[in-house]
From Swiss-Prot:
Keywords: Electron transport, Membrane, Mitochondrion, Mitochondrion inner membrane, NAD, Respiratory chain, Translocase, Transmembrane, Transmembrane helix, Transport, Ubiquinone. It is a multi-pass membrane protein. It is found in: Mitochondrion inner membrane. Its EC number is 7.1.1.2. This is NADH-ubiquinone oxidoreductase chain 1. The chain crosses the membrane at residues 3-23, 77-97, 104-124, 143-163. Belongs to the complex I subunit 1 family. It comes from the Eukaryota. Core subunit of the mitochondrial membrane respiratory chain NADH dehydrogenase (Complex I) that is believed to belong to the minimal assembly required for catalysis. Complex I functions in the transfer of electrons from NADH to the respiratory chain. The immediate electron acceptor for the enzyme is believed to be ubiquinone. InterPro entries: NADH_UbQ_OxRdtase_su1/FPO (IPR001694), NADH_UbQ_OxRdtase_su1_CS (IPR018086). One of its GO terms (cellular component) is mitochondrial inner membrane. One of its GO terms (molecular function) is NADH dehydrogenase (ubiquinone) activity. The keyword Transmembrane applies.
């Protein structure tokens, strides 16, 4: 019974995160519309609330294209793996109701975020384009350099909270 409750809680958490991302993009589009003095996405329905759902329908009905010389499987698996990694990060966050009890939640966070580097590298490599490979390697170098500073800042916060 406890397994089913944790599974339902995890599924509810993932759905809430995905819906909140959709409405954060709506907020971003509204702010950009006001900054650029244009109408923005608030013309669909009541205050633009159905806009993220219309965007999702448009996204799912688009034609899928892929480079002819790409490694098909790794080209499509790497973004899906990146999405799952970013959703796994939310599992270690402390909520009012504990879904999963992590003693080393900070380490789990660092591991999940550092594995995201490999998805970018595989996506750049699998397209069989030199420009995509160079862009992927550049993104990997940037991500690794930012992760080192993030880990040091987290370690500093942890160290000062124990004192």
């Amino acid at each position: 019974m406890e397994f089913i409750l944790s599974l339902v809680g995890s599924l509810l958490l993932i759905i809430c995160v995905l819906v909140s991302v959709a409405f954060l993009t709506l907020l971003e589009r509204k702010v950009l519309g006001y900054i650029q003095i244009r109408k923005g996405p608030n013309k669909v329905g009541l205050m633009g609330i159905p806009q993220p759902f219309c965007d999702a329908i448009k996204l799912f009905t688009k034609e899928q294209t892929y480079p002819l010389l790409s490694n098909y499987l790794s080209y499509y698996i790497s973004p899906i793996f990146s999405l799952f990694l970013s959703l796994f990060v939310w599992m270690c966050m402390p909520f009012f109701v504990k879904l999963y009890s992590f003693n080393l939640g900070g380490l789990f966070f660092l591991c999940c975020t550092s594995l995201g580097v490999y998805t970018v590298m595989v996506a750049g490599w699998s397209s069989n384009s030199n420009y995509a490979l160079l862009g992927g390697l550049r993104a990997v170098a940037q991500t690794i350099s930012y992760e080192v500073s993030l880990a040091l800042i987290g370690f500093k916060i942890l160290l000062f909270s124990l004192l």
